[in-house]
Curated annotation (Swiss-Prot):
GO terms for cellular component: urease complex. It comes from Mycobacterium sp. (strain KMS). It catalyses: urea + 2 H2O + H(+) = hydrogencarbonate + 2 NH4(+). One of its GO terms (molecular function) is urease activity. This is Urease subunit beta. Its EC number is 3.5.1.5. The gene is ureB. Belongs to the urease beta subunit family. The lineage of its organism: Bacteria, Bacillati, Actinomycetota, Actinomycetes, Mycobacteriales. InterPro entries: Urease_beta-like (IPR002019), Urease_betasu_sf (IPR036461), Urease_subunit (IPR050069).
Length: 105
């Protein structure tokens, strides 16, 4: 073994395997491009993005970790969303109030 060596497994890796997916259209109504990262709670994304934030509650983009989707001004774009996993708690963005998404206290 060589330090830092990476051993790859066989076959393809499916991201978000088994996750329920939601598809919606997003339009950037602003005058500058907006990028949204892979683990951002989508309803809290830039206010210039026009989409159904209520339907997107508890979801993030269905893209590989560490990547982002760029929304150009005035361009409609269809994206797939997946539910946030883990404890389903969101802190530090603009959710009011911050905390659990599923109503548990």
């Amino acid at each position: 073994m060589v330090p830092g060596e990476i051993f790859f497994g066989e076959g393809d890796v499916e991201i978000n395997a088994g996750a329920r997916r939601l598809e919606m259209e997003i339009v950037n109504t602003g005058d500058r491009p907006v990028q949204v990262g892979s683990h951002v709670h989508l309803p809290q994304a830039n206010a210039a993005l026009d989409f159904d934030r209520t339907a997107a509650r508890g979801h993030r983009l269905d893209v590989p970790a560490g990547t982002a989707v760029r929304f150009e001004p005035g361009v409609a774009q269809r994206v797939r969303l997946v539910p946030l996993g883990g404890s389903r708690e969101v802190h530090g963005l603009s959710l009011n109030p911050p905390g659990r998404l599923d109503g548990a206290s």
